[in-house]
Amino acid sequence: MKRIIKNRKEAYYNRKVCYCCEKPYEQAHSFYKEMCHECGEFNLLKRQQRTDLRGYRALVTGGRVKIGFETAKLLLEMGADVVITTRFPRDAYKRYEALHNFSEFKHHLQIIGVDFRNINSIHNLILYIKDKPLDILINNAAQTVRRPAPYYRHLLKDELLASPCENIISLYGDEKKQQEQLFPHIVNQSLNSAAMSQLKLLPEDNICNPDIFPPGKLDKDGQQIDLRKMNSWMYQFEEIPILELYEVLQINLVAPVILTQQLMPLLMHSGRKSYVINVSAMEGNFFAPRKNSRHVHTNIAKAGLNMLTRTVSSHLKQFNIFMNSVDTGWITNEKPNPQNLGPDKRKTIMAIDETDGAMRILDPIIRGIGGSEDFGKLFKNYHEYPW
């Protein structure tokens, strides 16, 4: 019996079912190895689409790594003026600076250090952004797996000591003074976004084990390797710390609501159609099967973000603002490192990558500029999907 069950598991994980249409296929697409030929061709066409965004101004929250980085990069390459937010602006700048075509769009990029856990950070961001109209708002920033303070410690030196940079906008005044304030009374000081990552708010923020966060070891995204045996993606409902519940709701839901509301006047006065994209996920989808009691806090936050789209989009349409939600697809395995997805190994190579996720975000905008007037919809794999 055990052998039969094992064979069934192997058959499930080795099955050839298209990532998009979920139909069986015999021959995989040449580029997308987990798609049928038809879906692969469609996705490749979408991956390569572009439009002229010269004269457009965009705000992308969470633009330092992964999908947020790719989204901002594509907007810049299409000619847009782009403002990104991140807790670590110096690290973000280094990532953009490393791009081969950075000199072509350097003067169109602004990076702002913001910690969305702090309502004052959001307020300061809004005050800065309000200097001129906005065409595109992409609510991408999210906390899915909470990382402890030591995870970010290696970034602090550059963030607090680096010389001024024309691409980085500081909302916090003199950072050298903030560095002096960092210790020993960190909780009581006014900190910049990078320094706030070192606040010790939960027991995990006191981890000192180099075997868990090995110094100098980075993952495929250039981020600290995290070898914890458990993380918040695996938390059952009763295991979620109250503070983490608050952080997730604040970052993933409250911040997008505030930004959309407060930046409405800028979106209304852009002089053309403007766009709000709420970056969602299947965790927040009521229609999706296979729901369980893990990471309930992220599910709730994404469901709330979807409800923002459903309830506000018709109102925004009156002002020529087109709001939609987009599921970017499964790009990162959030399970803790030792966990296995299949019978033999942890899945690390996904069916799509960050560029595919970014193009899913940008697709409603590109089609909108081409004449489409979609609003109040959830898109998955470029198609409308049930809520």
Describe the function of each predicted region.
Residues 15-18, 33, 57:
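Residues immediately within or flanking Cys/His clusters that coordinate Zn2+
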Residues 18-21, 36-39, 276:
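Short cysteine-rich clusters marking metal-coordination/redox-active sites
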Residues 29-42:
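Cysteine-rich micro-motifs
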Residues 44-86:
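Canonical Rossmann dinucleotide-binding motif of NAD(H)/NADP(H)-dependent dehydrogenases/reductases
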Residues 106-110, 128-139, 151, 209:
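A glycine-rich helix->loop->beta "capping" turn
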Residues 114-132:
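Conserved Rossmann-fold cofactor-binding substructure of NAD(P)-dependent oxidoreductases
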Residues 142-249, 254-257, 261-320, 328-347:
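Catalytic loop of short-chain dehydrogenase/reductase
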Residues 359-387:
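Core catalytic loop region at the nicotinamide-binding pocket of NAD(P)H-dependent oxidoreductases
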